[in-house]
């Protein structure tokens, strides 16, 4: 972006200067529409989400058979929702501000199969593609027991096809693991931010890992180009895929079921706040769509991004979406939160969800390290830095009077609020890597 254009943009959007200075900030969205109007702009419906849930149910017998870790939930890929009262108390002490309401952790960090939120969207899209191919070939019917897919004849059939994806790590991991299990040939195009252990894990499964010295955007673009050369190759597009998005959206319906089981009330007097780490936007965007369908006006969805990679905040704030990158305003897009190291947000998610997402904030890397150490110390739960991005959300909400006034959130309502921190990854991090994360804040 030319300097002149940037100067004009900064006059119109003064918050850009704060982003350029790598400062932490909270911006709440003044452009939210009434719920039904905003949902209509997404281009997808509740019926689409229910069909995604039904597809996952069809695959459950197969998943339970080939991934023993899913057997306890009969092949359902779902994570626990746990109360973290000690963490809440520790955060209150750290910020010298009593955080009211109840704090919960949604442990997508420990989802079965691939240990991150990407197990929702990534695995779902691979399954949807496999189902389509097998049905078109006359090998599978919707009413079949899908555990039959665990046969050499199906693996041989799928081996004629290739799946490709560009990733900073976790999406590649989920798609690589699932595709290889079904028998597909897989190529994962990985950016410079991707952790070595994730590449090693994929290679051990026979996945072709293509490494780039550049960032996420280049890995996606090169993956897309390579896939276009092969008519038998299906490219999973993290930036634009509605299938991925629907896989994530199922989480909203599932969380509502968990709330019912735990008798957690959500209504006008008992608001729900959900804090979601955001990279390119597909995961948090899809989950938020599902949450808005499930809880309506009573759920507040807040996105969290590293100060070095605030691509969704920048795109939605300026209205430029994927037409602007963090590099255009001079940011380096280098962060310890490798899963969030994305310079240009998904245009599809930004435009679809801009009237639904309630707020956005940025967080320093050092703060991420402190938060994962605090969670480990108070709750004995280990997550990766990306997963901690949402943990400052309750503090921002409760210390921003304009936001509270806009949504008519009284002290009494906040007293009865539920706060859910969506932990997005970390369950598969090797112990020695996790130890480095946890000791980082002590050594600085």
UniProtKB/Swiss-Prot annotation:
Any Pfam family from its record, for instance, is PALP
Q: Which HAMAP family match?
A: D_Ser_dehydrat
Species this protein is from: Acinetobacter baumannii (strain AB0057)
Q: What class of enzyme is it?
A: lyase
Q: Which CDD domains match?
A: D-Ser-dehyd
The UniProt record lists the EC number as 4.3.1.18
- Molecular function as annotated in GO: D-serine ammonia-lyase activity; hydro-lyase activity; pyridoxal phosphate binding
Q: Which PANTHER family match?
A: D-SERINE DEHYDRATASE (PTHR48078:SF9), THREONINE DEHYDRATASE, MITOCHONDRIAL-RELATED (PTHR48078)
**Cofactor(s) needed by this chain:** pyridoxal 5'-phosphate
**One GO BP annotation here?**
D-serine catabolic process
Q: Which UniProt keywords apply?
A: Lyase, Pyridoxal phosphate
Provide the family line: Belongs to the serine/threonine dehydratase family. DsdA subfamily.
Q: Which residues carry this modification: N6-(pyridoxal phosphate)lysine?
A: 118
| Name this protein carries in UniProt | Probable D-serine dehydratase
Q: Which reaction does it catalyse?
A: D-serine = pyruvate + NH4(+)
- Does the keyword section mention Ribonucleoprotein? no
